[in-house]
Amino acid sequence: MPKGEGKVIAQNKKAHHDYFIEETYEAGLVLQGTEIKSIRNGRVNLKDSFAKVEKGEVFLHNMHISPYEQGNRYNHDPLRTRKLLLHRREINKLIGYTKEQGYTLVPLKLYIKNGFAKVELGVAKGKKKYDKREDMKRREAQREIERAFRERQKL
């Protein structure tokens, strides 16, 4: 793998189901030593995690990084709040988005890029139940079209 490309460690598939993703940002993570080792082993869960802007800084909450197996008593807290590294103008944009009604910050995926752990952060707006049903109908219709097309190709 070339040095610049990132290796995806974890994805938040539920985020695309529950939210409309308006915009995405790449952010670095402030981690402890045993956390990065657990991330490299793929022991991360983004399921219920979210980000908040507090006092001009962005923090990631509820991201579960399992304790490192070979770690000793100095192992990290699995659910601790982690600071995200973004440029000031990006943080200001995120502050503007989160001030609007209905927008939240959701981590979409976690990956390693040039040896550093990065999070793809999405500015998201919640879907209503009928939006989810509409998406399911659209996906099912697309599957039917592809299935019919494949059957036609066989003939």
From Swiss-Prot:
Molecular function GO terms recorded: RNA binding
Pfam families to which the protein is assigned, alphabetical: SmpB
GO cellular component: cytosol
GO biological process, one term: trans-translation
InterPro entries documented for this protein: SmpB, SsrA-bd_prot, SsrA-bd_prot_CS
Coiled-coil positions: none
UniProt KW Isomerase keyword: no
Keywords recorded for this protein, A-Z: Cytoplasm, RNA-binding
Keyword Cytoplasm: yes
Subcellular location: Cytoplasm
Family to which the UniProt record says this protein belongs: Belongs to the SmpB family.
NCBIfam families recorded: PRK05422.1, smpB
Function: Required for rescue of stalled ribosomes mediated by trans-translation. Binds to transfer-messenger RNA (tmRNA), required for stable association of tmRNA with ribosomes. tmRNA and SmpB together mimic tRNA shape, replacing the anticodon stem-loop with SmpB. tmRNA is encoded by the ssrA gene; the 2 termini fold to resemble tRNA(Ala) and it encodes a 'tag peptide', a short internal open reading frame. During trans-translation Ala-aminoacylated tmRNA acts like a tRNA, entering the A-site of stalled ribosomes, displacing the stalled mRNA.
Name of the molecule in the record: SsrA-binding protein
